[in-house]
């Protein structure tokens, strides 16, 4: 593509290019874990999806679960023990695991043993070893395991990946991205498990940093081979009696063929997020790609030419559930599968090791 044709980059590109056939029916979901994200984002997204419906809620709080069951017309409410015992397995086809990170493996493996497909929140687990066990359990059971990454279904991000592959910005040289989100709960409350390293597996890096990390891998179509990182530990006292986690993480990733990426994640700075791909001939900038409900703002430049695009707002969480259900109903292998989650955790572990040792670590 030359500079004169760059304006055609966003002409009539499909918003759901992953959907190449019709999907009949709806996937009945059991939602395991009813924390803030499940209540505020996931359950409303499932309600807005044309291919999903929630039939079962799993929680340690019966009162909360019953209230939400009434709100979202869920037929069954069970405890975690009841879910493990398989009390209402006939009521759902797939399981959405939205528990704190340390419990992802446990409930994914329970679901696989029940023969249910799994959409598991990111990060897939708190360690590579656990994540690999989850992948093996689902493969042995013959069920789908999708890591709940939203960016693979966001139309503008998918289009930017196509433009990079098509060489619109030349050869990709560098990806930079950041995700800063000030945690609204700065107190050491029970619901603030993200500040407990034994439950979260880390802090800002494993919670927010996986977004620019995973999106860089997605756009480049490659895995990092080396990592260098620094972290700043939370000293605010918000962690309470928990082990302190990093409030900020800055990392650099080396990819094959001399390509690299830099990323930043933060719990304690002004909330903002960006992703930029620099190539030998131009660049692509995505404004606010990680926010959940996004404006699809993209700027593409090549030489002296420049074009911009702003689509209709997209709820990435709705797109994520729609995509997962489509994959289950059509037998399609999801692109952010379990092994994708393992690859990110392998990089995250290298990032943490590098920050601790103060030197580059091979991934």
Where are these regions (language model features)?
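A short, Lys/Arg-enriched amphipathic alpha-helix followed by its capping loop at the start of a domain
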Residues: 44-52
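NAD(P)-dinucleotide binding in Rossmann-like oxidoreductases
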Residues: 240-246, 254-319
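C-terminal helix-rich "cap/oligomerization" subdomain common to oxidoreductases
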Residues: 1-22, 58, 63, 69-75, ...
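Glycine-rich Rossmann-fold phosphate-binding loop(s) that bind the pyrophosphate
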Residues: 34-35
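Beta-strand-loop-alpha-helix segment that lines the small-molecule cofactor/substrate pocket
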Residues: 94, 100-101, 105-150
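Predominantly a Rossmann-like dinucleotide-binding segment in NAD(P)-dependent oxidoreductases
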Residues: 151-238, 358
